[in-house]
Amino acid sequence: MGLLAVLLALSAVVAGVLSGVLGRAAFEEGSAARRALTVDGTAGAEIVTRRAADPAVQDETVRRIIGSCFGDVPVEATRDVVADPAVIAGASEAEPFARWVIRPEPARITAEHLDPLARGATALRQQLRSSEVGVRGVQVLGDLEKTATAAARNLAVARALSWIPSGLLAIVAALAVSRVTRLLAITRETETLQLLGRGATGGQVLFANLVEAGVVALVGSLAGSGLAWAVLTLFGGVPVAPVLAGGAATLVLVLGCVALAGIGRLRGPGRDETSRLRAGRLRTAVAATSLALIAGGAGLASAQLLRVGSTIRWDRESPVPDWLATAAPALLLLLAALVAVALLGPLARLAEAVLLRGRGLTGALAAAQVARNLGAFAVAAVATVLAVGTTLLAAGYDGTAPPLQQRLRNLTAGAPVVADLREADAEVGRSASQPSTPVWRYPEASIGPVKLTAIAADIPGLAAVSGQNLPEGLGTQPPGQRLPVAITPRLAEETGLAMGDEFQIQLFSRHLLAVVAANVEAVPGTTRSNALLADAGSLRRALESRGAELPAPSQLWLSPAGEDPREAADRLRGMPGVSAVTVTPTEAAPDDPSRLVASRFRSAALGSVVLAVLGIGAVAFTQAGMRRGQVAVLHALGADAGSQVRGRVLELLGVVVFAAAFGAGASWLLCRALMAGLASGVVAPGTVSLPVEPRIEPAWPGALLAVFAFLIAATTWALGRVIRGQIRDGHFREETP
């Protein structure tokens, strides 16, 4: 019954972890979709046209088109009549306009609705233009198409990147189940020998084990998945499918591992010494070959990730996982776990030899037991390496990718507050009463066939409001009325320009002679990789030399000092000449892919720690049952309870501490080498490449590892209680086959 209880707990925990992670991912995606559509009020589309002679037929036609465009997507369409020119230009009491407002129903929207919603908004515009709905024209206004398209793209990126933590968790779960079931099979070897000795065939024993394991695994999977579903329901509910998928995967995994472990143990009994030696050499060869294959796969995957610089590729504007690069973190951590197991035996024997020279025997005996029971202690070592490694890798992603996304947001906006200007008005800048600078944007600039975005401003003022270090000297006009500019590395690569090169640039409808005066990592106000920065004064003089004038600035950038940016934005909105004001968000958007993927990493880290505690507990208590006779013998030889408990705890803690240190070191190296590629998956193609500085988030990983350490301490305490109970039991009799 004890072994069945371990198998039941294993099935329940694995099912709970997998169902919880999959269900939480589905819940977060649905929540992100709903919040993305309602972050600034519910996104919607407006159909505006003059009211037809027969309004009922017109309304029926519009609703039929809406239904054909959006299909099963839950949207609500309302109609009203507008006769106020302040609402719609041209409307009047004599000739009112009909308006249909289409909004998604947030309570029913799921992540799967975003793509059809975006396509429907695009199709709506096309179908209305070719229909007879409009009376002297029809307009489709609103931000539904733009918002839904951006949200669908962000969630697609998050899903493509989520295969990284999903792969880590899959490796952890598979190894935990396979190692623990193998340990259980070893524990039941005596019982297997008894059944074979009484005439049972190997097939009958295997079938009985599978039936027994199937019933236990089914009960455990249902219990674990049910508990996960109940917990997730408290936070708002999730679809049943992901939860059931976690339970089904657990059942298949447990049965498969039980079958493999059973077949392996059935081949062992009844063989002579020569066969056993041959089998041992074969296992060693298989282990070495597996290690070499995994090392080769990890090397290829890492090389692919370093070569392409990301774990996703773009196929027609759609993110697709690069499966080889995506597998790199999981394969490297798996390799680290296997290397740790390979080192565990030699290090244990070395520790035994060193400790034998000391006075006490407890440490030496503990090291000897680890060296002699590597099959059991390998479970604890692998589980600990993967748990600590996954947690620190998740901490590295959490500390690197979201800050990179925030830097891109800041770079796109340019400044904390950006006002779009309809016309030049010096009063706007003076009334802002904040550090501000006018900015000229020209996204249609070109150098020969190469298209680019040009930004011009007073460079010191731009540096002050954007917070970026910008090159000096762009305001100094070189001889010959050449325009000094700073270019991005990508633009330099595409045009072949280097420092001091002169070239012709099409800028503000004029061809100007420019010179590369500096290189700049990125240009404030755009994330485009092809970008150029110029000083507004130098640009004005260059245009005047060609008989042209610098047009009015397109934007005013502000960096409020001692004032909330939203208050500064509200004040700007009422000023003449201002068409729109944008405040750069300081928090991640609801559909920010880096935030969603970081959450997946945290779930994988939590799941790996739970599975590690289960694996270590299984090692401790199955070993306690298998070595009960050893406890009685040592007690008869004079070993007191305290020394035996200390020795057994030292065995377990020695393995766990070694594996934790090894996993932490491997994960740190992985973060330093590959985190730039993992974090860069959130960067869209054509976006400027910013340097990535890997940083490990310390808060939640520290708390999680502290809980892990506490649970290991509790396990050792419980193990000590079990051993003391065995010593007090005076009726123990070793069973013999």
Per-range role (PLM):
Residues 459-468, 492-529:
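Mid-to-C-terminal secondary-structure elements
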